Regions:
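Short, polar/flexible loop-turn hinges at active-site or ligand-entry regions and domain interfaces
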Residues: 49-52, 94-97, 116-125
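His/Glu-based metal-binding/catalytic segments typifying zinc-dependent metallopeptidases
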Residues: 12-38, 189, 196, 215, ...
Length: 271
């Protein structure tokens, strides 16, 4: 693990078994009701366009030139933190006919997407925001329609009611609808300035001066109040079994049971 900047770690895992190199940026932020929706939208809008690639056509053309490189984004819960991830996967340089490093070009592209988004007057572009909001709302409603997923999410919200982990990872439909280009821009600034960041590369080799390029981006930022993703508030022991019934017009019922235990640093105990 390499220290890149304050609250920013770099990790290179050498692996020759695969034909591709994977580069990921992982941002850890506190899981809070008032910021969960904006944060969850960030990885998706950041990997959809940028200043250099302002629309899907320009972005897709660049990915095709990188031999079909693939962009991915996700927003998950990690204990009491929200984990925002952006990744790019590209074939290793030894499989290409180009003289320039394909992996280096892909890493530069992802870095630009994160640090140079398509914004104007301290706000994300309205069309981009509305598109991602629509997709997020469809995702939330889709989880409700998928009863197994809905049952699991309801279990977690009941088990951890009043705690950070009980918050829905993408927020509610109402919270997503309230997002504006300005509020999303503020969330982006907060992510870059206060998130704990882990940059991970898995592949045959590290792109030339990769960590130096990342460090240069963070050097220009005022990093403060860095999220400590190791802190996790312990759940109070349950005095009795809590049973929740929820009636719905479905053909098949779902039974979900949840058990909570303490977190341990010892590998043997965790296993």
């Amino acid at each position: 693990i390499v220290s890149i900047a304050q609250g920013v770690e770099g990790l290179f895992i050498e692996n020759n078994r695969f034909n591709t190199t994977s580069i990921s940026y992982n941002f850890y932020l506190p899981l809070r009701e008032e910021t969960v929706a904006e944060n969850a939208l960030l990885p998706f809008i950041l990997t959809a366009s940028s200043k250099k690639y302002p629309d899907f056509s320009a972005l897709n053309l660049k990915l095709n030139k990188l031999y079909g490189a693939r962009l991915d984004a996700s927003a998950e819960k990690y204990g009491d933190c929200q984990l925002l991830s952006m990744r790019i996967s590209v074939i290793n340089d030894r499989f290409t006919f180009d003289s320039d490093s394909l992996v280096k070009a892909a890493s530069d592209m992802l870095l630009g997407l994160i640090f140079e988004p398509n914004t104007e007057n301290s706000a994300f572009m309205g069309n981009d925001v509305e598109r991602e909001k629509r997709k997020a709302i469809e995702h939330i409603k889709g989880e409700i329609a998928e009863k197994r997923v809905y049952a699991k999410n309801r279990l977690i919200s009941e088990m951890y009611k009043g705690e950070a982990y009980g918050i829905q990872k993408c927020g509610t439909v109402g919270q997503v609808e309230a997002i504006t280009g300005e509020s999303l821009y503020r969330a982006w600034v907060n992510m870059l300035s206060s998130a704990f960041v882990r940059v991970q590369v898995i592949g045959e080799s590290l792109p030339p001066k990769f960590f130096e390029a990342v460090a240069e981006k963070f050097e220009n930022l005022s990093r403060k109040d860095i999220t400590d993703c190791r802190l996790c508030k312990p759940t109070a022991p349950a005095k009795k079994v809590k049973t929740v019934f929820e009636k719905m017009d479905v053909k098949q019922g779902k039974l979900v049971m949840g058990f909570s235990s303490e977190m341990y640093g010892d590998d043997d105990v965790s296993l």
